[in-house]
Amino acid sequence: MGLTGLIQREFSFVRGNYLTLIVSWVLMDFAVEMPVPYYQQYVDALGGNVFPMALGIIGFANFFVMAFVAVPGGFLADKFGRRWLIVPMTFATALSYLFFIVAPFWQLTASWHLILIGTILQSFCLIYQPALFAMVQDSVPQESRGVGSSIIHMIHGTFNTPGTIIGGILVVTLGLIAGMQAVYLIVFLLFLAAATWRLKLKETIVNHEKIRFRYFLSSYSQAIRESLNVWKIVPRTILWLFIVQVLTMFTLALTNVINAIYARDILGVPQDQWYLAYVPMLVTMIIASYPIGKMVDKVGMKLPLAIGPMVLATSMFLFISGNLYSIMVSIALLGLVHLFMMSSAMALSACLVEPQNRGKITGGVNFVGYILTGAGMVLGNLLYNIASYLPFYLTIALVFPMMLIIIFRISEPKKEDRKY
């Protein structure tokens, strides 16, 4: 078989809904990372320097709202289908970026309050996330889940990094405030294009019951009840995997909320060079995504899951007292952490959880994970104000319980025993 035939066979599942989602992610991932290098500095300039817990409060509000909508999101995705949530909420997410554009003009209160409002609206729109992940699992065959997941993460890494570079150049060229406004205008337009493209999605869950918006509120108690009950019927491994996933989200939040400020104020990295720290992640994600996906499919899911926390600890050690170059390596390693842990976790969950329960499981993981992420951001911001290095050392300390759980509590089913 020639190279072309091999590629066609290996990626034959890239079609339909999966292909539509990939194209939309290319647009959205390029856009969403554009403001990342200078987001912390933007909030700082809009009044965050006067109120030093602004970043932590915005981060907590972001993930608290995401947690609030995660459970009904999973329930509604399983009950009524995926598409009806994904498409409208992608349009609404695009509109939320308008708050980020006009924030510098806001005079009634501190300008960063408008960032807070836009963030809350954006977080509510992410009620569609469980539907999104469930649609991916519905659309990728069992034997290709590792590669399918890795392609998603490769897209995140590949198109994130050009976004950070272009966003960084705009900010350096136009100045912090005008540059970030230009960046958020581009983000708004690209999200609008992605939402329009997602109109092509086809529903994967057939349900003839009419959808009513009152279910957003009336279904909440039922959603909580069903989301709790589903944990009684899934294998115990899924519960331990859940603990590892939410611990990972918490540990990453501890440092993500202050890493740019830490690099500027503690390590002395010049603000106009900070965006360069994200460049090596591009090469890393492109090179590593496919091999890690094949590793998950061929070698198994537990080994890459165990490698992830060790890479995380290494990344933190490189960041704590590093320079621009060691920070580049550190951020590239964080990309590997996502590849190892998310690819293996998604594949393991897909082969152990029935399709009709995947939305609820994802919603449950997101619910607890988002609360812990918000708490991690507040705690990370607080610890930074006490002693700047504390968030990094706490992250390293939490690697040990994660490793113990993965090694001794998570079991991987044999291929012949996988039902889904």
Question: Which positions does each model-derived feature cover?
Answer:
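C-terminal membrane-cytosol helix-exit motif in multi-pass small-molecule transporters
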Residues: 188-209, 402-411
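Hydrophobic core of transmembrane alpha-helices in multi-pass small-molecule transporters
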Residues: 26, 110-127, 326-340
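Transmembrane alpha-helix termini and helix-breaking/packing motifs in multi-pass membrane transporters
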Residues: 162-179, 375-391
